[in-house]
């Protein structure tokens, strides 16, 4: 599976009239898009990426962006890391936009149905991801668990939390500092597909790992300009 390419709209400022209009920027690199993302454009980015990931993941991606030259510096690092993750874990979906990365696993890749223990094959995937996180230590990570809508809200909330915790625990066992990882369970609150179909429910059962620059990397990036 290739790195997901999400079309982004960015801000174009008309200096003569002081007005702003949205335009497509497919010709820009991911890094250039990261440099141009501001508050208004971020909302458009969120709407587009949100078709592939939940609101919590998208919010973390946009909320961590600083834009400008510093954002471009961070974007170049994220370009490299995203490509390496996709090569190492071809069955994951890697969404690379702006100044961050979302790595998405269908829950069937990681867990048996209704279970929270990682499959043996899944441990290899998380081990590969942990190796990348250790290679790029100046990032913060959110691990977000999601379920489909079958079952009660309370049960699914707990299931999503336990699955996120299982991914974190294995990453920590592979040397990733626990302090870098935050787990979040969203139950069935953030579907990305129709829960009325088997395919939709399968898409909604997922774990999203969001990778963004930490404060140290942002500080380094801001000094580059």
Model-derived regions: residue spans:
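Short, low-complexity, glycine-enriched hydrophobic/amphipathic alpha-helices that associate
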Residues: 26-84
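Amphipathic, membrane-active segments
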Residues: 78-105, 109
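Periplasmic peptidoglycan-binding/anchoring modules of Gram-negative envelope and division proteins
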Residues: 87-88, 111-145, 172, 202-204, ...
